[in-house]
């Protein structure tokens, strides 16, 4: 069993942490905000448009001009696998106009709830208000992370990890 750090508590980070923990790793999830999934709350006007239910080839045609760089990722875990994953967590979904997939409740908070429940079931250590300042390396491999926690006023804490997943998100809404 190895120690894995996941940087970023958005959808990708929460899923990465769940999957790593499900594969037997000891996982710590670092999120700089006060709660997980902050950006999820605002997607789809607060309803959380999870994915699109169209065929994979149609998905590529609709969203990308040059999608080749995404082929291996999408064919490994496509939109239908994502829907199956959330269904397995107990999230009821519905498909609307344009094949858009939403939680049946129309509440993004339900998506965050099922992911957070899964993190707890998998015993993922969650560090909120904690900013990873550096991924530490010995020159050949990752050895840990250096983090600061706003809540506990801990600064420059270096913690050893065998692997690090960076799921830091984008800057579409920089305040999230």
Annotate each language-model stretch with its function:
Residues 7, 42, 166-167:
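Redox-cofactor binding/interface segments in oxidoreductases and associated redox assembly factors
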Residues 10-12, 35, 170-172:
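Residue-level detector of alpha-helix initiation sites
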Residues 2-29:
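N-terminal Rossmann-like FAD-binding beta1-loop-alpha1 element of flavoenzymes
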Residues 109, 114-176:
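Predominantly flavin-linked oxidoreductase catalytic cores and closely associated redox partners
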Residues 32-125:
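Conserved N-terminal/central alpha/beta ligand/cofactor-binding core
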Residues 1-3, 96, 129, 161:
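Phosphate-coordination loops involved in phosphoryl transfer and adenosine-cofactor binding
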Residues 15, 19, 40, 164:
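Hydrophobic/aromatic ligand-binding patch that stacks against planar heteroaromatic rings
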Residues 15, 19, 23, 34, ...:
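Mobile amphipathic helical/loop "lid" adjacent to a hydrophobic cofactor/ligand pocket
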């Amino acid at each position: 069993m190895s120690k894995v750090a996941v940087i970023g508590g958005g959808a990708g980070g929460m899923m990465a942490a769940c999957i790593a923990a499900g594969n037997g790793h000891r996982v710590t999830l670092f999120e700089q905000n006060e709660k997980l999934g902050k950006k999820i709350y605002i997607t789809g006007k607060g309803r959380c448009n999870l994915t699109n239910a169209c065929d994979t080839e149609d998905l590529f045609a609709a969203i990308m001009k040059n999608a080749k760089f995404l082929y291996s990722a999408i064919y490994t875990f496509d939109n239908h696998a994502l829907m199956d994953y959330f269904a397995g967590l107990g999230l009821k979904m519905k498909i609307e106009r344009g094949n858009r997939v939403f939680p049946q409740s129309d509440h993004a908070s339900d998506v965050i709830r099922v992911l957070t429940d899964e993190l707890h079931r998998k015993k993922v250590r969650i560090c909120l208000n904690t900013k990873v300042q550096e991924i530490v390396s010995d020159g050949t491999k990752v050895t840990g992370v250096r983090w600061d926690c706003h809540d506990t006023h801990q600064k420059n804490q270096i913690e050893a990890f065998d692997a690090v997943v960076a799921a830091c998100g984008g800057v579409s809404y920089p305040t999230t």
